[in-house]
Every structure is written in C-alpha cells, then in structure tokens.
Amino acid sequence: MKIIILHGLYMHGLAMQPLSHKLRSFGYQTKVITYNTLAIEKNRVFEKIDQALSPDTTNVLVGHSLGGLIIKAYLDKRKPSQQMVSHVITIGTPIKGASIVHRIQELGIDAILGNSPEHGLKMHHDKWEFTQKLGCIAGTLPVGARALLMMDRSILSDGTVTVEETMIEGMTDHIQTPSSHTSLIYNSFVPKQIDHFIQLGCFDCS
C-alpha cells in the first residue's frame, strides 16, 4: 500500500519527511509531494498526484491543513475509484474552510495567503460524498496566531484551525489530540492513527 502526502500552507515537502519516515516504518510505501502553496497551480499538483499513485497497489492520500483541501479538490476532479484510492486522512485540515482566513481578509492583509483561499480555504458549505473513507485528525493545543487575530480562546482549536472546522458531514471518523497546528505532523500519535484508520477503518480511541 502506498501513501501520498501533501503539506500545508507555507510549507515544503521536507516538512513532511518525518511523518513519511514513520509511515514507512509501518511497512507503507510513501511519496511526499511539494507544491507552491502561495501560487497554487491546481492542474500541476493534480498531475503530480497522478504520477505518484501506484497502479500496482491501493493508495492512500494524506494531507496536512491546506494539503487536505487539495486532496478534496483532486477527488472531485479526478474521481479515482476506491480500488485506486481507498482512504483519505486529513490532519488539521479546515475541510470546509478556515475562519482565520476570513479574518485575515477582513484585516486587508490577505496578500500573505497568495491564491490559497481560492483552493478551499474560504469558508464554504460542503459534505463528503466521495467513495473514499475519510478520517479527520484535529489538534487541541491553541498555540498559534488565532488567539491574536480572532480573540476566541474559548473555542477549541490548534491555534490556527478550530476543531469544528476539521469536521464534515459524511466523514468516517474524527479524533482529537493535544497538539498545535504545526506539531500535529511531528508527533508519534498521528502516524499510529493513520495506520489504524487504514487497517481498521476507524481511529484508535482507546
């Protein structure tokens, strides 16, 4: 089984190598895809995913933050079979858009986001209707810019994305962990949960 991994905003594929390494230790093939998150060329990213998918085994798509939204757009465009792509796991992904992005736009500093809001980060209503099983992982350690920009410390978040924003109607399972938005991809909890979700179709809540 092969896992294709996409990073989030302001990141490079190198940031996902520790997660990739941990997943390889579980016996998976992995491929990390790098793309320009501020000047997203959707078709080029989709072509990279096409090339990364193995025709000889089942594939899994894993995305951190914006990467999960790129995966959702990929499924909508390419509509791969469940035999080709069986599972999707999002890590800290605002699957229906991010309120912090709306706030940044209100403040008139949205140039820092490049064209990323046009690729899923704007708030939108949606539900998961793809054949692939979707597992969503959320952080609950509010370390990040959200507290300064949003002034909503009472809302459970990872410091960037709220827990509620990581949920979508139709998802298969959802789990929380005390991590910040960035540290989600560096702990040992996430790769173990990815493996559990792939193998059993649910997260390990024990």
What are the residue ranges of the model-derived segments?
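Serine-dependent carboxylesterase/thioesterase catalytic core
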Residues: 4-9, 14, 18, 22-24, ...
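C-terminal catalytic-base region of ester-bond hydrolases, centering on the histidine
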Residues: 130-206
